[in-house]
């Protein structure tokens, strides 16, 4: 006999959370509310932008709550009135206090985009690429008051391709996380899960990205710069200075050779690429975006922007 459906409150904000919300909406359990970050003004026109999770929740006619802070008394009272069985959290954007986590009958399950205890924090997907990891994954865990410190429920590994960008890996992990959450709920209901405490001595961290993280230091090796390009696509992007303008680099290829010139100097120009000296090896650049312009293939960039051998990126 199937257990009765659980009454679930879902917490999430960016696109990473969408597959998890979809799988809940399509499943047997009842999503009684969706909690997401408040609408924000963005861009030069200060246009009000709603979160991807709110957009999906509106499409399904779900009850939406958007507290500035989850510790607000009015929000906590609203949660108690809903009387949920479980919270499911995926990239919500706030740490939930103990007073909130204690409300649901069966606690709160978080979907995190790393193999905890490695890469706790806000930007695990970018940092696994930047650090040259070959494998990452997703974790479901019981939430406590710490940042990604709760007991582990299930984990699933996801290999990282050698040309993988943060954008592509993000989408694969979001999908894997949703499937893992579905499996986690089934096993919780069947009593087949034993939460495992994390080994905090093995914890590593993935702090939020800053725009300046994208600045390319050409004295680093081509492999490290290539990882930086892939890790910071789409944001903040990996960028350099050309003619006092910011130039984002989206696609590179590593060419092995001993250092022979000044890091950042253009050493070869093809019809659809340029090769730039680094601290170790060459980086072949194939796709760029000049500040205030659209992303373009290097072939198109060269047509309108004179670059010569010896040009130095800073």
Over which residues does each language-model region extend?
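An anion-binding loop in the catalytic cleft
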Residues: 2, 219-314
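Short beta->alpha connector loops
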Residues: 13-16, 68-71, 92-94
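Conserved beta-strand segments of alpha/beta enzyme cores
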Residues: 30, 61-63, 107
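N-terminal Rossmann-like dinucleotide-binding module
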Residues: 2-45
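A residue-level signal for conserved active-site and pocket-lining positions in enzyme catalytic cores
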Residues: 12, 34, 57, 87, ...
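Donor/substrate-binding cores of folate-linked one-carbon enzymes
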Residues: 5, 27, 37, 86-205, ...
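N-terminal glycine-/serine-/threonine-rich beta1-alpha1-beta2 phosphate-ribose binding loop
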Residues: 37, 41-85
């Amino acid at each position: 006999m199937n257990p009765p459906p659980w009454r679930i409150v879902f917490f999430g904000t960016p696109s990473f959370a969408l597959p998890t919300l979809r799988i809940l909406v399509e499943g047997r359990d009842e999503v009684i509310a969706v909690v997401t970050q408040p609408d924000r003004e963005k861009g030069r026109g200060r246009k009000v932008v709603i979160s991807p999770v709110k957009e999906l929740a509106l499409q399904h006619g779900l009850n939406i709550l958007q507290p500035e802070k989850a510790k607000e008394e009015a929000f906590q009272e609203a949660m108690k009135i809903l009387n949920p069985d479980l919270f499911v959290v995926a990239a919500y954007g706030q740490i939930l206090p103990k007073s909130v986590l204690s409300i649901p009958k069966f606690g709160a399950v978080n979907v995190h985009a790393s193999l905890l205890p490695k890469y706790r924090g806000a930007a695990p997907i970018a940092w696994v690429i930047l650090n040259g990891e070959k494998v990452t994954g997703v974790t479901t865990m019981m939430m406590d008051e710490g940042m990604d410190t709760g007991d582990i429920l299930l984990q699933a590994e996801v290999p990282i391709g050698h040309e993988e960008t943060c954008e592509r890996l993000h989408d694969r992990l979001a999908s894997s996380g949703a499937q893992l959450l579905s499996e986690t709920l089934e096993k919780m209901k069947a009593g087949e899960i034993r939460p495992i405490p994390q080994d905090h001595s093995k914890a590593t961290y993935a702090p939020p990205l800053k725009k300046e993280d994208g600045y390319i230091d050409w004295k680093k090796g081509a492999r490290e710069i290539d990882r930086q390009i892939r890790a910071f696509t789409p944001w903040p992007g990996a960028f350099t200075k050309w003619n006092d303008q910011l130039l984002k680099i989206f696609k590179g290829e590593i060419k092995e050779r001993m250092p022979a010139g000044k890091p950042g100097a253009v050493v070869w120009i093809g019809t659809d690429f340029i090769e730039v000296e680094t601290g170790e090896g060459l980086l072949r650049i194939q796709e760029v975006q000049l500040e205030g312009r659209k992303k373009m293939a290097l072939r198109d960039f060269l047509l309108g922007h004179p670059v010569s051998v010896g040009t130095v990126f800073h």
